[in-house]
């Protein structure tokens, strides 16, 4: 069983002026286990995307270490699939060629990679769209292709950076439910970033709330709304339940309180 371990991690970026620095993350400690769906929530600039970029191996920490399966993360790897806010698909390839592209780069034989891509496209409900070009798909369908592509290399972990931010409300809810189905069927580690409190509560088995810069994990909640959905298939009933509403208000109060404190410290007035 592979775990993602983030141990005493801080990140400092160069500032705008000579000798200036900006601390993006401060002393982050987090363990994500197989079968965890961890969602990071916080105000803009709290370091959520920086934390995901560290896990993906796109950047290195200024201090601390990140381990996957006990091995240090030294860069991007096939053991981590990434889904971005913008789908990053290749427009000159059709759906199935996009889905199998990572395996092609690894030199996997065509018949084998095609079989894997077919299975993963079926997992996200695109079994009838193999030959469609990307421009022929809706935004939600394009994100489904991105999810299928991330799954084809059988990563231990899926990293998702606000993948539904540009989708309409109905499509967003559909993709949320799809993600929970994929999570249930694969038991992979998920690390998901969002600005939506409702989305975070619905998806997360564990929610981490981060403070504004420097980003710190200030609150952690173990949740079961996702499992309740998988049992009942009634998202509306769950999102309108008293405990869901109470948790939403609790988290909103934390985030708004953090934003006000950060603005006051920066000398910004909120009207």
Swiss-Prot record:
Catalytic activity field: taurine(out) + ATP + H2O = taurine(in) + ADP + phosphate + H(+)
Top enzyme class: translocase
GO cellular component terms listed in the entry, alphabetical order: plasma membrane
Protein name per UniProt: Taurine import ATP-binding protein TauB 2
GO molecular function: ABC-type taurine transporter transporter activity; ATP binding; ATP hydrolysis activity
Keywords from the named record: ATP-binding, Cell inner membrane, Cell membrane, Membrane, Nucleotide-binding, Translocase, Transport
Residue ranges annotated for the ABC transporter domain, each copy included: 6-237
Subcellular location: Cell inner membrane
CDD domains: ABC_NrtD_SsuB_transporters
Subunit structure: The complex is composed of two ATP-binding proteins (TauB), two transmembrane proteins (TauC) and a solute-binding protein (TauA).
Family statement drawn from the similarity comment of this UniProt entry: Belongs to the ABC transporter superfamily. Taurine importer (TC 3.A.1.17.1) family.
Membrane topology: Peripheral membrane protein
Binding residues for ATP: 42-49
UniProt keyword Ribosomal protein, yes or no: no
Top-level lineage group: Bacteria
Record-listed E.C. numbers: 7.6.2.7
Function: Part of the ABC transporter complex TauABC involved in taurine import. Responsible for energy coupling to the transport system.
Keyword flag Disulfide bond: no
Recorded name of the encoding gene: tauB2
